[in-house]
Amino acid sequence: MEIKEISVPQQGVVADYMNGKKEIQSCFDYMLTEDAFKQRVQDLREREFFRQDLVTHLLEYNTKLQAGEATIQNVKALGDENTYVVIAGQQAGLLTGPLYTIHKIISVLQLAKEKEESLGVKVVPVFWIAGEDHDMDEINHTFVTKNKKIKKTIFHDRNPKKASASESELSLEDCRKWIEEIFKTYPETNFTKDVLQFVDDSLRKSNTYVDFFGHLIMKMFVNSGLILVDSHHPELRKLEVPFFKQIVSKYKEVQEGLHNQQEVIKELGYKPIIETKSNAVHIFMEIDNERVLLEDNQGKFVGKDGTYSFSYEELIEEMERSPERFSNNVVTRPLMQEYVFPTLAFIGGPGELAYWSELQQVFHTIGFRMPPVVPRITITYIERDIATDLHDLQLQERDPFLNNVDKLRENWLSNQIEEPIDDRFVEAKKEIMNIHTSLQQFVKEIDPGLSAFAGKNEFKINEQIELLERMLKRNVEKKHEVELNKFRRIQFALRPLGAPQERVWNVCYYLNQFGLDFVDRVMEKPFSWNGKHHVIKL
């Protein structure tokens, strides 16, 4: 593996944040400097955490996932007041979801290791699985290449239930068939059998989406020391009850903090991402197997436009009795993470970084400071045949990231012809239209009754010219079919559906191509935190 860095243009909050723009950096409590991380350690030492209860839960949960010894030791280390975490989170995508989930975990592992060395304190890596998520459409699919097209392959469970990812039971037989169909789209390699066995081992131990995700991730990173947490685990929810109560008692201040910070964001020229009602309580409650967002209505906590209603006392009582019924929304999830974990740094993608910039005053309302927010490492893999295609087309490795691949293809094709087809036909149509306009005027003067027919005649001529243009383009493309297929392969591999590779393709393809130690070998590479994109030649 060979790694290179390229500068890829970014936009909005992320671009300005990484470029050191002071205005947007002022929306975060810490700069990404070594002094800031030292200050963060000092700030965390002044706070109290329920470390022992957390350790007890995490030991039980990670042991069930068959965690390696390094993970168990890291969990135990969390009981020490001088241990901190680097954390990131994601939904429980089937087969681990898009590649960026893996890249988030790699980011967490690398930053935890670096900060432990530079700060001289114990830093452990934590990955937060968003188990409370009810949106199965976000996690029930993956993308494959089939018949020279990119296809979204959805897992249709025969017994779908309206439940969270932590509670949604998987039909193992259905899921196994779905996985086999996906692997049929991959080339048969020396690794295929082992990878299928690797995946099936995790599936057999799983009852839910979160189980399957957790087993796969733990198996993939078994020697890394990674700690997993299911955000919707009933035992974790019990530990979170005091903070749920605090949110309920301060929901108006939370909403005001969000509103005020979003006004700051607007004044800086950015468009806020988080959308909430002014009476939002920012907590979900599970009612009749449905996740219902609570709102304030004249001192009552209501859901579904008043279908459900609770007094403050009733809500607190229910939190104490059934904490597993409650979960956070986009505003309070980061707060709960801050309450539970002594967070040295949070690692997020571009979207997360943007919405965290709207939360500064929300954190302050609760009496917290936002942890340092570090943009995750971004990676694209270039396989040998794709590198050959780039070379054959005289393209640089950075070209597909800086330019639209379709545009690169069009430019290449036009360079194969002395005069661009589009330009020549536009010119021809213009000349013919001028001639025909004059001809129509002549016809009208002699026989006005033929004016309509003359107009149709012009339309027919245009149709024939466009047909000729299409046929010419088709023949030119056929002549250069070999080269144009190279562009298609580049597009599919590096910019599928016009998106970054890591937002579409799944890690199983690469495990199948390069072996079960693929992720371990990627983790051996030195990644930088300078905001540049990492390209790995395989």
From Swiss-Prot:
HAMAP family, sorted: BshC (MF_01867)
Entry keywords, A to Z: Coiled coil, Ligase
Lineage, broadest ranks: Bacteria, Bacillati, Bacillota, Bacilli, Bacillales
Protein name (database record): Putative cysteine ligase BshC
Coiled coil: 460-484
Family: Belongs to the BshC family.
Keyword Nucleotide-binding: no
Positions of disulphide bridges: none
